[in-house]
């Protein structure tokens, strides 16, 4: 089993006989606008795995980011509100005013 993060998209899949688990993102998810984490329980080869989703106050996070002068705030705000990666905003016609 391989567990990893940094992709911001929670999922479980099998690849070449191995279980791959991406835990998603607590602060900047890009698959849903809810935060996610993984619970893994078990011993040896017997285990259970659960992706857990929790509510995330996106507007509060955006307010904090604005208060500390976060660079590229507009792109970050769109990303948090839509769960769409900032590199896709232009081609989708997204702006913070929508």
Task: Label each residue range with its predicted role.
Residues 1-6, 20-24:
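Active-site neighborhood of phospho(di)ester-bond hydrolases with catalytic His/Asp-centered motifs
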Residues 9:
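Short active-site segment of divalent metal-dependent hydrolases/proteases
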Residues 14-98:
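Acidic, His/Gly-rich catalytic cores of divalent-metal-dependent hydrolytic chemistry
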């Amino acid at each position: 089993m391989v567990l990893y993060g940094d992709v911001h998209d929670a999922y479980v899949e099998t690849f070449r006989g191995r279980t791959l688990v991406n835990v998603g993102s607590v602060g900047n998810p890009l698959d849903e606008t809810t935060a996610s984490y993984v619970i893994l329980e078990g011993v040896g080869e017997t285990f259970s795995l659960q992706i857990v989703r929790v509510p995330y106050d996106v507007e509060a996070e955006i307010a904090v980011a604005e208060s500390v002068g976060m660079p590229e705030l507009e792109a970050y705000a769109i990303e948090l509100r839509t769960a769409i990666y900032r590199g896709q905003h232009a081609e989708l016609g997204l702006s913070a005013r929508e």
